[in-house]
From Swiss-Prot:
A cellular component annotation (GO) from this entry: cytoplasm
EC number of the protein: 2.7.4.3
One Pfam family of this chain: AAA_17
Location in the cell: Cytoplasm
Protein's recorded name: Adenylate kinase
Residues noted as binding ATP in the record, renumbered to the chain: 12-20
SUPFAM superfamilies, sorted: P-loop containing nucleoside triphosphate hydrolases
Keyword set, alphabetical order: ATP-binding, Cytoplasm, Kinase, Nucleotide-binding, Transferase
HAMAP family referenced in this protein's UniProt entry, alphabetically: Adenylate_kinase_AdkA
Main location: cytoplasm
Swiss-Prot/TrEMBL catalytic activity: AMP + ATP = 2 ADP
Superkingdom of source: Archaea
Organism: Aeropyrum pernix (strain ATCC 700893 / DSM 11879 / JCM 9820 / NBRC 100138 / K1)
């Protein structure tokens, strides 16, 4: 039911700041002697997609045909576990930066369906949240990413509600805990402290 190492899936809608929280978490964990191996699920999908000549950047992955995304998703999960097994052995925590729900050209798509969960076997699914207004503002400021299709404050609000529900639905399959971590503006370090506290209690 579980890997020798602990698995924590950190989710959040685009622009919520989960990657920033994870970076803060890494620094805190190092200070406290907690061994982490951090991966970005999208990077693993992108690597395979680029090699196959399907896309040039990660924001284009969600525009691919759904069945193609499914293949990339399955391959990413397998590669992540293989890498973590080598890096962590039987000790430490695998942190996976990903989305519980992705807005695609064919509708909302689960980031943590059964075939992915069967590979990852998460101990915890952490949902990083902020107010929809803050998230929409962060999206607007980030000119390095294409997020126009998310849909402004109302679009963010709907996506956040559905993503939280998707996280809980995914957690049921593996009896994973679900943790809601608030990432208020300028308080990523505080969010990381809370996340580390929860991880240490697993």
């Amino acid at each position: 039911m579980r890997h020798p190492f602990k698995v924590v899936v950190v989710t959040g809608v685009p622009g919520v700041g989960k990657t920033t929280v994870i970076k803060e978490l890494q620094g805190l964990a190092e200070k406290e002697g907690v061994k982490l191996h951090i991966v970005n699920f999208g990077s693993f999908m992108l690597d395979t997609a680029v090699k196959l000549g399907l896309v040039e950047d990660r924001d284009k992955i969600r525009t691919l045909p759904l069945r193609r995304q499914l293949e990339l998703q399955r391959e990413a999960a397998k590669r992540i576990v293989a890498e973590a097994s080598k890096a962590l052995g039987g000790d430490g925590v695998l942190i996976i930066d990903t989305h519980a729900l992705v807005k695609t050209v064919a509708g909302y798509w689960p980031g943590l369906p059964k075939h992915v969960l069967d590979e990852l076997k998460p101990d915890m699914i952490a949902v990083v949240e902020a107010s929809p207004e803050e998230v929409a503002a962060r999206q607007a400021r980030d000119t390095t990413r294409y997020r126009v299709d998310i849909g402004g404050v109302e679009g963010v609000k709907r996506l956040m509600e559905n993503a939280r529900a998707a996280s809980i639905a995914s957690a049921i399959q593996y009896a994973s805990t679900v943790a809601i971590v608030e990432n208020r503006e300028g308080e990523a370090a505080k969010a990381a402290e809370e996340l580390l506290r929860l991880i240490k209690n697993l």
